[in-house]
Amino acid sequence: MEKRRKSILNKPSKKQSISYNEGHGFKKEVEIQLIKYLGRLSPEIEMPARAKGINGSNSYDVDIHITIKGKGLFANRGDIWVECKWKDNSPVRESDIQKLVIKAQDAFRHVTELGGFYYDTLIMVSNQDFDINALSYANALDVLCLRFYQGQLIEKNAPMNWVGDPAWMKQENYLKAFRS
């Protein structure tokens, strides 16, 4: 019995953690595909970036910051926060989307009180699929979910207003979606 317990305890884990180089490589691949995906919008990529929270001491890593500069007289400018989520074997969960939304809301509150630019679009990109709760939560708060699969980005949901004025910016809509 003692030998069996030792062998179980010393057994190497099948779960492999991703190294910095692999994670950075994933982000670079996502960046290349996002340029293609958003090509007609003339994206400018900044990698990595930071977002300040409400008290200024909270500062969040932004995996990829994309600035959209529309063309023409009435062109809008937009700033996109892209979160790259590498998962070993599990799908992206609702809690993963919640963490991104909470960080973005904190950064948005910082900007509304102190001024500056803000991220008006959230995109979550993962190498794994998204579970159904994550997708419904993302749809309710207008977060676009993309899966990076075989070198391509695949849309996993269809939020109504993921560019410009998404629901996650409006506190009452956030609370309704969070409680449901």
Can you name each region flagged by the protein language model?
Residues 1-180:
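Mixed-charge (Asp/Glu-Lys/Arg
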